[in-house]
């Protein structure tokens, strides 16, 4: 046994000399597995469903869903959260459709946001790789995978066949990006669209664009859907949205959450505080009346939402208590401190 231990130690020493310290490590070494560093999605319910309080840094994330389901809104809210924590964010706008005014309404500091509108898919992914390798960018959003058009397709004629070209481009880029993303602790979000497979009789005919590579390289995959409209009389104020965590490498997957996206305002934090507060018995509900700490705060959900908007301190207190209760102990406390500091 001693001979084997000596041989292993000699091999480890040689590997460290050749490839640098930390090339091979024991998982039990102190400080090797730090707390997962996260960026909030802007939705309290989704942060809790993700199990770690947000989207994990140093990982690849995929957000996909039908048109007008809230994919870009969710990504922009994550950018706003990143900027509130003092981070730097970049938006690779392959669709050439970023609305700066809308982004500003969601809380994005537009003047500080790095934006690129590349001509080809290769250019977009090369820019992403250079930003990741700089180590100075905390969050990069690519909108969207479907718009990452290979150079050969752009230079070719309409109707030319380019079988599998985009899938090969994505596969090659992700092989190159993954290690750099981990080293730089950058969060990279790919927004993706849905397509239908032809001739599927049984099972789900839906698939995402860009081949299978992104499915494998993603640590978290979020399926976002619009499930209804929020109305005031005949006027539509927003969308009821459902997000399912279909893949999660950092916590248990398959959790789902519902929240409201209000047009021009983004994800309604106050509505989530009401729903989660009642569910976790932090906010009492008797008939149409809501109470907190024994004091009535409003009649009807809309009035309570208005109360939280006018009293951000109480809203912040409820959010902190929810995070500490529903997230892993150390993670919940850490994120609650960051949320309070940002406010």
From Swiss-Prot:
Gene3D superfamilies: P-loop containing nucleotide triphosphate hydrolases. Keywords: ATP-binding, Cytoplasm, DNA damage, DNA recombination, DNA repair, DNA-binding, Nucleotide-binding, SOS response. GO terms for biological process: DNA recombination; DNA repair; SOS response. It is found in: Cytoplasm. InterPro entries: AAA+_ATPase, DNA_recomb/repair_RecA, DNA_recomb/repair_RecA_CS, P-loop_NTPase, RecA-like_C, RecA-like_N, RecA_ATP-bd, RecA_C_sf. This is Protein RecA. The gene is recA. One of its GO terms (molecular function) is ATP-dependent DNA damage sensor activity. Can catalyze the hydrolysis of ATP in the presence of single-stranded DNA, the ATP-dependent uptake of single-stranded DNA by duplex DNA, and the ATP-dependent hybridization of homologous single-stranded DNAs. It interacts with LexA causing its activation and leading to its autocatalytic cleavage. Belongs to the RecA family. SMART domains: AAA. Its main location: cytoplasm. It comes from the Bacteria. GO terms for cellular component: cytoplasm. It holds the Pfam family RecA. The keyword Nucleotide-binding applies.
């Amino acid at each position: 046994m001693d001979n084997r231990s000596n041989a292993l130690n000699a091999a480890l020493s040689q590997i460290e000399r050749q490839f640098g310290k930390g090339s091979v490590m024991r998982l039990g070494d102190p400080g090797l597995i730090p707390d997962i560093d996260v960026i909030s999605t802007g939705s309290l319910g989704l942060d809790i469903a993700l199990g770690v309080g947000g989207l994990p840094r140093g990982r690849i994330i995929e957000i996909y869903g039908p048109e007008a389901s809230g994919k870009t809104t969710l990504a922009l809210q994550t950018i706003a959260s990143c900027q509130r924590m003092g981070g730097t964010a970049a938006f690779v706008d392959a669709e050439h459709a970023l609305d700066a005014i809308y982004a500003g309404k969601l809380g994005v500091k537009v003047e500080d946001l790095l934006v690129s509108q590349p001509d080809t898919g290769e250019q977009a992914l090369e820019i992403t790789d250079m930003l990741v390798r700089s180590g100075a960018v905390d969050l990069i959003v690519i909108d969207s995978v479907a718009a990452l058009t290979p150079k050969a397709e752009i230079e070719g004629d309409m109707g030319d066949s380019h079988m599998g070209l985009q899938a090969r481009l994505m596969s090659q880029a992700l092989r190159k990006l993954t290690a750099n993303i981990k080293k730089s602790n950058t969060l990279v979000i790919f927004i993706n669209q849905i397509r239908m497979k032809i001739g599927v009789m049984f099972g789900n005919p839906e698939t995402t664009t860009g081949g299978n590579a992104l499915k494998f390289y993603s640590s978290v995959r979020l399926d976002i859907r619009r499930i209804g409209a929020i109305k005031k009389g005949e006027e539509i104020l927003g969308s009821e949205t459902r997000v399912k965590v279909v893949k999660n490498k950092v916590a248990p997957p398959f959790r789902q959450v519902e929240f409201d996206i209000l047009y021009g305002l983004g994800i309604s934090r106050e509505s989530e505080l009401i729903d989660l507060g009642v569910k976790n018995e932090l906010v009492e509900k008797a008939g149409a009346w809501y109470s907190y700490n024994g004091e009535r705060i409003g009649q009807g959900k809309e009035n309570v939402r208005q109360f939280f908007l006018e009293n951000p301190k109480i809203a912040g207190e409820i959010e902190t208590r929810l995070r500490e209760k529903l997230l892993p102990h150390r993670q919940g406390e850490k994120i609650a401190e960051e949320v309070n500091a940002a406010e």
